[in-house]
């Protein structure tokens, strides 16, 4: 998937505490490292951990002059599949755009779930069991880390090398080298997934 607009726009749907803001920050910093212009910002209220959140990212080769929330995304990333029960995450996505979902469900099952809530989506759907991969490799449910690899694979908006470098830069001192290496392995596994 390549840019088809001047500004590549992403919406992350998650629940508080799932790391959508951290994932957006890593993508944004990777883009900056590649010489691109970016914006990354969350939208949430005073809710506590577990409440639905949105995080927006914009990437461009030119200066970004808008500051509104993203309304016409190129990619939607869903870190918690239960959000599909309450949000029409495919609103304003067209057939050239992509939906990445952390789930064990098949593409057909995701389409059925969307249809239950009156949503039709004819673009590409990329399911990935980010929780499963994270539990297997990291030993904790960290879907935001795994989803980075799938995001890079699907969009090519930033390189895998840049994402890994930024992850290491941001988190190695915080979580230690061993945990950092496991997270990077999880990112790479998602990137290599079908």
Where are the model-predicted features located?
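Active-site cofactor/cluster-binding pocket
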Residues: 1-194
């Amino acid at each position: 998937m390549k840019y088809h607009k001047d500004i590549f726009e992403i919406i992350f749907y998650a629940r508080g505490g799932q790391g959508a803001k951290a994932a957006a920050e890593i993508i944004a910093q990777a883009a900056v490292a590649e010489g691109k212009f970016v914006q990354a910002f969350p939208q949430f209220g005073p809710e506590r951990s577990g409440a639905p959140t949105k995080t927006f990212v914009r990437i461009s080769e030119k200066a970004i002059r808008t500051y509104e929330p993203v309304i016409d995304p190129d990619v939607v990333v869903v870190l918690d599949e239960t959000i599909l029960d309450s949000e029409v995450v495919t609103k304003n996505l067209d057939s050239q755009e992509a939906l990445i979902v952390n789930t064990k469900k098949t593409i057909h099952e995701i389409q059925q779930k969307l249809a239950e809530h009156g949503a039709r989506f004819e673009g590409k759907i990329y399911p990935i069991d980010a929780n499963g991969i994270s539990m297997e490799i990291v030993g904790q449910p960290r879907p935001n880390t795994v989803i980075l690899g799938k995001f890079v694979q699907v969009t090519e908006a930033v390189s895998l090398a840049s994402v890994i470098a930024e992850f290491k830069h941001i988190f190695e001192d915080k979580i230690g080298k061993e945990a950092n290496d496991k997270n990077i392995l999880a990112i790479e596994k998602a990137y290599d997934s079908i």
